[in-house]
Amino acid sequence: MGVEDQPQTQPQTQPQQQPQMGYQPQMGYQPQAQMGYQPQAAPMGYPQQPIYQQQPQMGYQPPMGYQPQVGYQQQPPQPVYQTYCHDDHQPLLHANVVVTTTQPTVIRKSNSNEETAAVIVFIIGFFFSIVWLGGFFFIKSKSKTARTFGILSVVFFFLVLVIVVIVVSVTVTAAEKIAEENKDYYYSTSTGYYSTTGYYSTTTSYTTYY
């Protein structure tokens, strides 16, 4: 048989390895060659088979005709709106907002004025009792001192009023008794005599005792 009658054999090629997603080749990796191994020559009339040589994986190179995927731009995350449902059994959590405000210091002179007026009314009432009636204006005062003097003024006014009523009633009663006693000491005496003319005449003498 001649050389032409021998069957033609196709050269065997190594299948291309598909790239693994997320796999990074190891840097510096070199294939280890077997010691003493030599490729055998093809027999006469057969085409020489290509010798497979393992190449180091120095970074993956895409095969010819492969178009890399175009990376798309990641959209920013959309805001998530969370709704809260009110439950009568579960209290809602609210953020405590603390607001600090500075208030100016206001010096109120009304209390001191009320205290002074209440003291004046209380003192003048000893000379003119009717002035003690002004204590009614200080009974509901916010100042404790003014309220105290106001109450004292009102109490003293009613005490003096009761004393005056008692004194007047006693004086009137005593005056009536004195008048009755004086009336008893006041009397008249009558003496009668006959005159020479035969007529009866009377003389009245009044004696008043003081």
From Swiss-Prot:
The chain crosses the membrane at residues 119-139, 148-168. The keyword Membrane applies. The keyword Transmembrane applies. It is a multi-pass membrane protein. Its main location: membrane. PANTHER family: EXPRESSED PROTEIN, TRANSMEMBRANE PROTEIN DDB_G0267530-RELATED. This is Putative transmembrane protein DDB_G0267530.
